[in-house]
Amino acid sequence: MNDTLTSDVTGRRVEVNGEHATVRFSGIVPPVAELHPWHMDVPRLGVELKLQLSACITAHVPGLWLGVEWDNPERGKHDGSHEGTVYFKCRHPTGGSFIRPNKVNFGVDFLTAIKNRYVLEDEPEEEEKEQTVIIGNKPVETIGFDSVVKQQSQLSKLQEVSLRNCAVNGAGDKRGIAQVCPNIRSIDLSKNLLSSWDDVIAIADQLKHLEVLNLSENKLRFPSGLPSPTGTFSMLKVLVLNRTGVTWAEVLRCASGWPVLEKLYLESNNIIISERPADVLQTVKLLDLSSNQLIDENQLFLIAYLPRLEQLILSDIGISSLHFPDAGIGCKTAMFPSLQYLVLNDNQISQWSFINELDKLQSLHALSCARNPLTEEGSKDAQTTRQFIIAKIGQLRTLNKCVIQPEERRGAELDYRKAFGNEWKKAGGHQDPDKDRPNEEFLAAHPRYQSLCLSSTNGFFFSWIESMTVQKVKGFLSRLLKVSVSELLLSYESPKMPGREIELENDQQSLQFYSIENGDCLLVRW
């Protein structure tokens, strides 16, 4: 790059010796120290040794300088000021440097990067064939035309493109992308030199089939006004914005332009969720908010009503507590109605009350919660911890990527009952439903314990089954389910009589009267 620069250089993304930065200033600066290598020849015993040392030489030649803010602040030397004059500002006190323009790489356009990576060079021939083609109405003689056509054909077939770390700075020619590679469906543009969301739009607007877009590690300026043009991202299903500096407000502002988006990755952006999505992100099924400081559970509640959200990744967000205010003990929350898979790795979860709350999620089937104080090996036997989590979350099918087999669940729930059986009795628990009155403290600590006492390896089975009346069963279920006795209707099914349901219509009769046996299934309706 020459010392002559255009006026719009400020804000551009650049690369210097593999390190990325943003230009914050261009102009004349008084003498500035530059880092140069220097050599010293040391003759010793007839052998010439060459030592290469790094030293700062303060030799300044007047001219243009660029003030840059490095992505890696350890790469810089100052905060954008020099000898008391502030030329630009940095977020970090050592994030800035002054660099000569000829040391800086401003990158290449999208098509140049595509051709550099994907065009296969033909084997050199002794003599290129001469060919005549018609352009307009005139015949034109060409040399090497076959090679050009072949290259264009290669690019037009591309559907998945990876241009990671290829110094892409923008779209280039206005319609060039649409003409050369119109069939691209997936692009990895991570760690490039894109400066703004407008740069992204200029590329995406030419790719009408674009479904997957990865923009990670591009420090982008997002619009403060109007949302994305309608139609630009009409097919986009996956968008990755990890480490782009995007804010939650900017996400919501742009999201109206993502009408069919299903997966959104926002890792490591210092995001604070400040408002509830209104009429945007309603199609999102997966949301990754990892490595953003979302310690306050109230931030999460702002996204709790996204209707299609099935997977939520919250690794390393610093969260330690959780309470769904709309659901009491043994009840399900209305929040996160479709959530099936939750990732909570690398957080500060240390209390079992957090796990208890997860049982309130009505659709949760899979959980990852590795590397938390509660689950760290050494804090408690790892297998016991796994058993307790399984017992506390009744609908869980997968824990830390390991499928929970039926045998494992039965064993976990049995061991959990045994582990806290004495505590249950001391708290007022009793096998006789009329005497079963565990205190609120126990129920809060073990919300599922009462229901586990009802179950055995095959459906519902009561240890006192032979003497229990239908009325007693209803009384027990009324307290457990918090439903009026008068609203409960009981019946059962037996493997011995497939397809037949028998109603328990006489409250005064015992279950033995109806010939209920171990292995039968008690049905409860209200």
Q: Where are the regions a protein language model picked out?
A:
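Short coil-to-beta-strand transition motifs
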Residues: 13-20, 61
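Acidic glycine-/aspartate-rich tracts in secreted/extracellular proteins
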Residues: 29, 71-76
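A short macromolecule-binding patch
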Residues: 74-102
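Short beta-strand-centered aromatic/proline hotspots
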Residues: 19-30, 44, 50-58
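Long, contiguous C-terminal flanking segments immediately downstream of a protein's structured core
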Residues: 2-9, 17, 92, 101-526
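Short, acidic/hydrophobic/Gly-rich beta-strand patch recurrent on exposed beta strands
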Residues: 67-69, 491
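Short, solvent-exposed secondary-structure boundary/capping segments
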Residues: 30-46, 58-67
